[in-house]
């Protein structure tokens, strides 16, 4: 019995084309850039507990990764049952790194205590802890509020 391969050519062509599209799709999926992975630590509404939130931050052409990270951290968590580090409305006036030290200047809005916000000193400590854990090259974090050193 002789097999006529000519009648199977359309089937083989369809299979090969499908495989090519599948491989191209897998390639695009593997190349997809989600951004750099960061772990944010936020205080939980249950006293003494913390919530870890993973975020992928893409490169921002207008900011350094550190500045972008600090902005996201000050905005707060996207998860329920977490407290804010600082009063909503607090802004990062400036954030830069020099010789493995980060200098952050926060707006004066930080001094107004709001609902569901940790104490200012605890918020600053968590800010420092978040930066030190996610940016291992940083050795020290200096925080200023409206241009004045925080907790002098």
Predicted regions and their residues:
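Bimodal "functional hotspot" detector
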Residues: 1-152
């Amino acid at each position: 019995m002789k097999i006529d391969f000519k009648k199977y050519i359309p089937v083989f062509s369809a299979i090969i084309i499908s495989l090519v599209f599948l491989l191209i799709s897998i390639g695009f999926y593997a190349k997809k850039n989600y951004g750099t992975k960061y772990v944010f630590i936020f205080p939980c509404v249950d006293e003494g507990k913390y919530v870890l939130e993973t975020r992928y931050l893409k490169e921002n052409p207008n900011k350094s990764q550190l500045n972008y990270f600090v902005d996201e951290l000050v905005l707060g968590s996207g998860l329920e049952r977490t407290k804010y580090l600082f009063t909503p409305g607090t802004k990062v006036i400036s954030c830069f790194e020099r010789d493995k030290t980060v200098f952050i200047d926060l707006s004066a809005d930080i001094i107004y205590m709001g609902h569901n916000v940790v104490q200012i000193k605890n918020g600053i400590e968590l800010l420092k802890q978040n930066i030190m854990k996610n940016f291992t090259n940083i050795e020290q974090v200096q925080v200023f509020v409206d241009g004045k050193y925080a907790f002098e």
